[in-house]
Amino acid sequence: MQTLIVTPNEAGQRLDKLLAKYMNQAGKGFLYKMMRKKNITLNGKKCDGSERLGEGDEIRLFLADETIAKFTGGGAAKPTSGYYPKPDIIYEDSHILVVNKPAGLLSQKAREDDTSLNEAILNYLIDSGHMPVEQLRTFRPSICNRLDRNTSGLVVAGRSLAGLQVMNAVFKDRSIHKYYQCIVKGRLKEKQLIAGFLRKDETTNTVDIYPLEVENSVPIMTEYLPLAWGGGFTLLQVTLITGRSHQIRAHLASIGHPILGDFKYGDRSVNEEMKKRYGLRAQLLHSWKLVMPEDLAAPLDYLAGR
């Protein structure tokens, strides 16, 4: 027999959904049969799987240990093998982490053998004792926003289910304010809001910018503020009004001011010179500030406006 106590990260979902995650090698038919026969109970009573779980609810599995081991895969595994350095944590509480992603590291895996920030965060939470590895069966912390591999800066991850849901919502509705800094070729003197249309080519993973709408394009808006100038380059603060793939890089390049070190949209001769002279291997684009919306929902309302 085994007893499961519903945690805050598991509350709110249906019983059958939780059981399917926990005993992920068992078929749905088996789980429903065990509930009908009262081999699986909820708070000491017969259940059918449709019950909405609350924190502290007690699920009992009147099954042999061998059966449980068979249908749970024998034990929860850590998300990755190998060595992951501790993430550069800027802020952490019980609901979220804010991490400084280095250039060159994927935000999330594209292939099974990839190394990514998401796995580094999971390993940190487990190794630090913040999250038991067994919890990965029913809840998996995850990042809420992604940066390009060669863009550095702030990435938010949800540590709790509530934190993950709230942060996913504000990134989706764009109510969180995102600020970047970058160094571009040429001189820009004044604050500007630029607009256009972006179309992505999925086969080449590149985007094109157009002044007018074209087929399969989406509208974009980017605001920049010059902070410093020297040596033929300008340091900009960039605010994303919309947030599209490669938007900052391609939009600035389209007005003749590509980001230094951007080998996809930038000036290749300038980049090669900077690589030769300074060892520059990634674009000088950094996500440096995030500001939460004033109406940030509970339980993260203590971060509203911060």
Show where each model-derived region lies.
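Pseudouridine synthases involved in rRNA/tRNA modification
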Residues: 1-33, 65, 82-87, 206-208, ...
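Thr-Gly-centered strand-to-loop micro-motif
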Residues: 43, 108, 158, 210, ...
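RNA pseudouridine synthases
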Residues: 1-202, 215, 229, 299
